Amino acid sequence: MSAASSLAPQRYMQDMGGASNASDVLEELKNRFGPPGTDNPGGPMGVVQKTGDDLPTQWVSRNRVHEVLHYLKLKAERPYRMLYDLTAIDERTRVHREDQPASRFTVIYHLLSFERNADVCLKVALTDTDLRMPTITDIWPAANWYEREIWDMFGIVFDGHPHLRRILLPPWWQGHALRKDHPARATEMEPFHLSTEKEEAEQETLRFHPEEWGMRRTHDGTDFMFLNLGPNHPSVHGVFRIVLQLDGEEIIDAVPEIGFHHRGAEKMGERQSWHTYIPYTDRIDYLGGVMNNLPYVLAVEKLAGIEVPDRVKVMRVMMAEFFRIASHLVFYGTFTQDLGALSPVFFMFTDRERVFDVVEAICGGRMHPSWYRIGGVAQDLPNGWDRMVRDFLDYMPARLDEYDKIAVGNRILKARTRGVGGYSIDEAIEWGVTGPNLRACGFEWDFRKARPYSGYDQFEFDVPTGQHGDCYDRCAVRVQEIRQSLRIIDQCLENMPAGAHKADHPLTTPPLKKHTLHDIETLIDHFLGVSWGPVIPPGEAFVGIEATKGNNGYYLISDGNTTAYRVRIRTPSFPHLQMIPLISRGLMISDLIAILGSIDFVMADVDR
């Protein structure tokens, strides 16, 4: 038995609930807090909003939201223990807000209950003149970075926040980028000029002041050392800075600093058409390929009412699992390299090239093929695809057996990773951890099983779990996930349905050619659909999937236009990095290197 396969799965929750439990929470809130009132827009417990995804959405007044959130997490019979996402909307130019209370800015709390297998969204309406909210960092520590992001992007102040400062944009930035009156392109801004004085001032803003973060410079007559790890260091896996407070070689505390890789991915979604935004999704987790396309196109299809053919579902699953393997191979190789083993990364990258050979033959591209489409995929499977897939499936298992010997079975790797950087299931949920990093604690939660999408309920596969939530288990879980992805791909190969690779729907994009062959009007519709993109009906929809690094979700708002009114990207790596201080205190820098490698993140997934 390999070291990876010795992990004993264990279930944390027996009652996973069901979709029928989703609306129960609204009645529960009504019984607990009473019917709608009049003290704020929407009342204490105000309007129940209808959305395109049937996600229970309740408007709550600002002066009651802290109380309601506290109840849902700590006092409800089946609590919502994870703060899945926290974001905001600038509503000032939105036209279609039927059956919603007046709001100039809206704050959205997205909660997840594992006991119910259900989510709930709470919305709070704000006016231009009073953009203030109570912090919820006393309820969820994971809210810290989310609240900082909302202040950074929208200018909404969270009273009581321990350190409300910019997080994605630099300290010297003027304005709040996701407001509708903020420029969306560099051509809409003044030409950039970096004078010597400005350069020096910007550099000074990067100087670390421990007192601002509640850190002491000395203790018992001994000076602490403050060390910059990054933003240019090979072991931080991107442009990422961690300021370490050290007592000798021991880490006393750490301050992660992100934002160096921020590109405005959500803002771009407001100026790209629904179709032309697809390539931008590839660049979020840039190792995940088409996996990034999937939650986006699924959310658009919910808004548009598109049901794709079974063949499309299976093709999407197959290519998503190929990219899961490719991403995990990068993780596997770089993780062992971080720990001092230089050979495995070359073998694993060679096998990743074999994955890309298949991907390129099917999609026409390698790392970022942008192959999924609204209503389908870009083209049908090519001749000979089945032979290429079968050759890979026959080749890969033996390679994984070899990797078990040289990597996860290696005694040096075990010594460096077992018992290092561990956390419990409760801590993982508290901080918003999802994906393999959550399952490494022993919690068998996988969106493909718990909330099947794209036909995943038709596939047989296991959900690998760990026991201790440490660096070793995080690695071992991913190794086993590669084997499970091979099982899924094999089932796709053996059971690929016949049929079309696009839905026969007027909003499928690009539209079907046959729709042009009737009269001049259908030709015009086709031309507009190709050049400007589809007009998606007004509404809101969220879709989350089990991506390579955890749960990746897209929350989309359509205002009845060819572009999105709001694109919110919920990435797994953002909350994962926020945990670094918790799991690194008391360890050595070499342990932190192992922790960073085991988290499996890319900074584009964090900074967007």
UniProtKB/Swiss-Prot annotation:
The gene is nuoC. NDH-1 shuttles electrons from NADH, via FMN and iron-sulfur (Fe-S) centers, to quinones in the respiratory chain. The immediate electron acceptor for the enzyme in this species is believed to be ubiquinone. Couples the redox reaction to proton translocation (for every two electrons transferred, four hydrogen ions are translocated across the cytoplasmic membrane), and thus conserves the redox energy in a proton gradient. The keyword NAD applies. Keywords: Cell inner membrane, Cell membrane, Membrane, Multifunctional enzyme, NAD, Quinone, Translocase, Transport, Ubiquinone. It catalyses: a quinone + NADH + 5 H(+)(in) = a quinol + NAD(+) + 4 H(+)(out). GO terms for cellular component: NADH dehydrogenase complex; plasma membrane. PANTHER family: NADH-QUINONE OXIDOREDUCTASE SUBUNIT C_D, NADH-UBIQUINONE OXIDOREDUCTASE 49 KDA SUBUNIT. NDH-1 is composed of 13 different subunits. Subunits NuoB, CD, E, F, and G constitute the peripheral sector of the complex. This is NADH-quinone oxidoreductase subunit C/D. In the N-terminal section; belongs to the complex I 30 kDa subunit family. Residues 1-199 are annotated as: NADH dehydrogenase I subunit C. It is found in: Cell inner membrane. Residues 223-608 are annotated as: NADH dehydrogenase I subunit D. Its EC number is 7.1.1.-. The keyword Kinase does not apply. It comes from Nitrosospira multiformis (strain ATCC 25196 / NCIMB 11849 / C 71).
